[in-house]
Amino acid sequence: MEGGGGGADAQAQAQPVAQAPPAMQPMQQLSRYESQKRRDWNTFLQYLRNHRPPLTLARCSGAHVIEFLKYLDQFGKTKVHASGCAYYGQPSPPAPCPCPLRQAWGSLDALIGRLRAAYEESGHAPESNPFAARAVRIYLREVRDAQAKARGIPYEKKKRKRTQQQQPPPQPPLPPQHQPGAAAGEASSSSSAAAAAVAAEGSGSSAATAAATSQTGGGGGSTTTTTASAAAPTTATRV
């Protein structure tokens, strides 16, 4: 009996432990632009599959892209007045009219931009991009002008910033010693100081002359005193 129990324990240990299923990693959320671009690309591919006669992406041209844009007009929500409508050219008509709804020019322009990027991201050469064809650009320009006149909403072009002409950089200010005004001020100050010094020397020499004259006029005693005082340092030097 004990041996049978040991075999049961061995079988229990041999059974693999059931592992929990790995947690599903959350899918990376696409941005709003990327999601819209993917939807637009799938819509265009579906349009090519339903096209009669069948049309492949390699044979798609700018004319087919324009045909696709006209096909989308039936799903538009923008009122575009006809030339014979009484509200033609009025941005806010007072009453409804039987004019059809169309895709707004701004929506078509943004759509072409997304499809143009999606075409190149799918591995196709930019040179063969039908969404970048000149005919598509001309068609979008015509739609823009026609809707602007019909809706009475002028299209304002974005003003491009004009490249300012490169002007030479301003020269740095000269140091004080090189500035004409400062040099003139220093020159005038130096001249004034020199004139004051000359005047002081002149007054000193005049005073000395006056003193000498007064001593000379005082008689021989003063002369002897001056001579003695002058000779005194000589005697002291000899000692």
From Swiss-Prot:
One of its GO terms (biological process) is post-embryonic plant morphogenesis. It comes from the Eukaryota. GO terms for cellular component: nucleus. The keyword Nucleus applies. It holds the Pfam family ALOG_dom. Residues 1-35, 149-239 are annotated as: Disordered. Transmembrane segments: none annotated. Probable transcription regulator that acts as a developmental regulator by promoting cell growth in response to light. This is Protein G1-like8. Residues 9-29, 179-215, 223-239 have a biased composition (Low complexity). Residues 32-159 form the ALOG domain. Belongs to the plant homeotic and developmental regulators ALOG protein family. A motif (Nuclear localization signal) lies at residues 157-161. Keywords: Developmental protein, DNA-binding, Nucleus, Transcription, Transcription regulation. It is found in: Nucleus. GO terms for molecular function: DNA binding.
